[in-house]
Swiss-Prot record:
Record's protein name: Putative dihydroorotate dehydrogenase A (fumarate)
Reactions it catalyzes: (S)-dihydroorotate + fumarate = orotate + succinate
Summary of subunit composition and partner proteins: Homodimer.
Organism classification: Bacteria, Bacillati, Bacillota, Bacilli, Lactobacillales
Protein source organism: Streptococcus pyogenes serotype M1
GO biological process, one term: 'de novo' UMP biosynthetic process
Length: 311
């Protein structure tokens, strides 16, 4: 029997597919739609210390090859999502979940994570170090010194399962430098990648979105090659205890298969989920299992990370 079951840290999942933060996760109702689908889990909207309305609209647009957005981290505040995942966990009848959070300063991040430490929530936390769409706030994980200092401080007080959402890296030396930092800490996972920041899409001589004069994060087909490169680069560099979540350009079982082949333990779907809805998880799971059967693979472990190189 072909299985797409997987594991992140000490958490087991009966499937390897889930939503990406930012899609179908703003409200409890949206999260429950993902919960009731064939997705293995859900990740919440990235929660900040306070409620945020986000950037002015229009701030999202579908494009021929994917999407562009400058949402600006709209969310209901981290406590809204923390309370929700905590309540679900207490029932004992739900899947393990991911709580996505970030502060707009190191102090805010510390306040949020200490509140999670003090809570009943024992699930996974995804710290978003890679949002490209908050005006005046750089993507933290591009600053290696700041990232190192932030993680060093976090792990002086935070002992629950924690992973980080990364921006895409484009230089081999940056993979080396980033991995050297991440390997110093007890991270449960890294998520590769967030959208490629500050793209520009034009139609009829005009930009598609309003914030930042049309500059926004690019998702969908555009970013799959970059996402696969990041997944594989970190798979080859990170210690085995740090699992990898692959995100970027996934809309078919073949896409998911390639992320796992590059080293991903789980795969998140963003743009295609926004376009197709939670039914996508059933379709992509079936397509992935079909590929596995054709190739004689019974489990993800049979091919994870087994990308072949040219002689």
């Amino acid at each position: 029997m072909v299985s797409t079951a997987t594991q992140i840290g000490h958490f087991s999942f009966d499937n390897c597919l889930m939503n990406a933060a930012g899609v179908y996760c703003m409200t409890k109702e949206e999260l429950m739609e993902v919960e009731k689908s064939q997705a293995a889990s859900f990740v919440t909207k990235t929660g900040t210390l306070e409620v945020r309305p986000g950037n002015p609209e229009p701030r999202y647009a579908d494009t021929r090859l994917g999407s562009i957005n400058s949402m600006g981290l709209p969310n209901n505040g981290f406590r809204y999502y923390l309370d929700f995942v905590s309540d679900l966990a207490k029932t004992g009848q739900h899947k393990p979940h991911f709580l996505s959070v970030v502060g707009l300063s190191p102090t805010e991040t510390e306040t949020i994570l200490k509140a999670i430490m003090a809570s009943d929530y024992e699930g996974l936390v995804e710290l978003n170090l890679s949002c490209p769409n908050v005006p005046g706030k750089p993507q933290i994980a591009y600053d290696f010194e700041t990232t190192d200092q932030l993680l060093e401080n976090i792990f002086t007080y935070y002992t629950k399962p924690l992973g980080i959402k990364l921006p895409p890296y484009f230089d081999i030396v940056h993979f080396d430098q980033a991995a050297a930092i991440f390997n110093k800490y007890p991270l449960s996972f890294v998520n590769c990648v967030n959208s490629i920041g500050n793209g520009l899409v034009i139609k009829d001589e005009q930009v598609l979105i309003k914030p930042k004069n049309g500059f926004g994060g690019i998702g969908g087909d555009y970013i799959k090659p970059t996402a696969l490169a990041n997944v594989h680069a970190f798979y080859k560099r990170l210690k085995p205890s740090i699992h990898i979540i692959g995100t970027g350009g996934v809309k078919t079982g073949r896409d998911a298969f390639e992320h796992i082949l590059c080293g991903a333990s789980m795969v998140q779907i963003g743009t295609a989920l926004h376009q197709e809805g939670p039914a996508i998880f059933e379709r992509v799971t079936k397509e992935l299992k079909t590929i596995m059967v054709e190739k004689g693979y019974q489990s993800l472990d049979d091919f994870r990370g087994n990308l072949r190189y040219k002689d």
